[in-house]
């Protein structure tokens, strides 16, 4: 029973990290590619049109005077919540679009390995292209051992059509994040 609970906990933890890193990657893509920020103009125009439609709709409803304030507050709440949901969805979609190809390539490389812990594939955390040198730097969150990464370096290069400059290393910004 404990093994199932541990497996379920690890799977939920992995999914939480994947969702969080999708948001982080989406925000990073908005910063790296300013042209994507046109999406916010489209969202603002769409919300303006939606607000006008809601006002017309509210005028056509005949609500009892006792419920009028509750109805108005509910409509204001909806007008606040819907843009927040759209913003989060757009950011997650951008993160997903940036990560899907790289993660799929790594799943092909590591998908048949029996010693991949809990069958959890690497999650793309950061992806940035250096404009001066043209080098794309990728950072993954993974539970796969360093030995397996080093054994699979050639397969990774072939499947992703890349050349790895330097060594594959552990660590995040402070070099203390062991799974990045």
Language-model features, listed with the residues they occupy:
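Accessory regions of macromolecular translocation/handling assemblies
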Residues: 1-180
């Amino acid at each position: 029973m404990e093994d199932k609970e541990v497996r379920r906990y690890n799977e939920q933890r992995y999914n939480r990290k994947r969702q969080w890193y999708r948001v982080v990657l989406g925000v990073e893509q908005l910063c790296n590619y300013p042209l994507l920020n046109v999406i916010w103009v489209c969202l603002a125009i769409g919300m303006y049109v939606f607000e006008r439609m809601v006002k017309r709709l509210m005028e056509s409803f005949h609500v009892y005077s006792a419920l009028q304030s509750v109805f108005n507050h509910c409509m204001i709440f909806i007008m606040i919540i819907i843009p927040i949901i759209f913003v989060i969805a757009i950011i997650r979609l951008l993160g997903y679009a940036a990560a899907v190809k790289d993660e799929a390539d790594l799943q092909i490389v590591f998908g048949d390995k029996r010693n991949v812990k809990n069958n959890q594939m690497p999650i793309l955390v950061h992806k940035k292209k250096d404009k001066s040198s043209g080098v794309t730097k990728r950072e993954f969150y993974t539970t796969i051992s360093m030995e397996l990464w080093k054994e699979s370096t050639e397969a990774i290069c072939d499947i992703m059509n890349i050349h790895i400059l330097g060594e594959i290393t552990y660590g995040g910004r402070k070099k203390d994040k062991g799974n990045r």
